[in-house]
UniProtKB/Swiss-Prot annotation:
InterPro entries: C-type_lectin-like, C-type_lectin-like/link_sf, C-type_lectin/matrix_domain, CTDL_fold, NKR-like_CTLD. The chain crosses the membrane at residues 76-96. This is C-type lectin domain family 2 member D-related protein. Lectin-type cell surface receptor. GO terms for molecular function: carbohydrate binding; natural killer cell lectin-like receptor binding.
């Protein structure tokens, strides 16, 4: 039995040798594992840095879509403000120009309708009395209707009376004191001699030949006239 136990236990020097070999082997394994651990740590560090950069990139990419629309909105608001300002300026200029042009536009007079049996022309109403009377009585009839024997102030009114009267002669409001005196209207304002009056008598009438003078007592038809009320309107 002692010999068998002795055979199983290695010699002391061999045991130490094995132990040293195991330690060296362990050290080699440890040294061989060391770089792997360091490499893993470096890889983990590199991976963390890459992830950090990727996260920052994503953060920037996430912010850019928000920043760009904000800048675009600001630009749009600025453009809108400029557009509105220009619109206001254009409207103001248009109004100013229209106001300046307004005095150049001739106003058209819109006259109220003349009363029944009266005819409107220009700013007057005319009544053609078909009953023959002398000049004085004809003037009285006109006054009863708040009018006077007819007066014309321009060639247009005279031509209207000549066209409308037909072929008959009509008393009008011209008269004078004598053949040497100037002609006047019934309100005693001077006649402007727009058309010469033929004859030497003191009372005027409208004939086919234009304006003529006749005796007061001759009976003729007559024309009354009076100013018409009106309101001025733009065309």
């Amino acid at each position: 039995m002692p010999s068998s136990a002795h055979l199983q236990d290695p010699p002391p020097h061999l045991s130490r040798t094995l132990t040293q070999d195991e330690e060296q082997t362990s050290l080699r394994q440890s040294s061989s594992c060391g770089p792997s651990t360091t490499s893993a740590s470096a890889s983990e560090s590199l991976s963390g840095s890459t992830k950090s950069r990727i996260s920052q990139k994503k953060l920037l990419e996430g912010m850019l879509p928000k920043i760009i629309p904000t800048e675009s909105a600001a630009k749009l608001l600025c453009c809108y403000a400029v557009f509105m300002a220009l619109t206001v300026v254009v409207i103001a200029l248009s109004i100013a120009l229209s106001v300046k042009k307004t005095p150049q536009i001739s106003a058209v007079n819109t006259y109220a309708a003349c009363q029944r049996n009266w005819i409107g022309f220009g700013n007057k109403c005319y009544y053609f009395n078909e009953t023959a009377r002398n000049w004085t009585f004809s003037q009285t009839l006109c006054k009863e209707q708040e009018a006077e024997l007819a007066r014309f102030d321009n060639e247009e009114e005279l031509n209207f009376l000549k066209r409308y009267k037909g072929s008959s002669g009509y008393w009008i409001g011209l008269h004078r004191e004598s053949s040497a005196d100037p002609w006047k209207w019934t309100d005693n304002t001077a006649y402007n001699n727009l058309v010469p009056i033929k004859g030497e008598e003191k009372h005027g009438f409208l004939s086919d030949n234009g304006l003529s003078s006749g005796k007061d007592y001759i009976k003729r038809k007559s024309i009354c006239s009076k100013l018409n009320s009106y309101t001025s309107q733009c065309p």
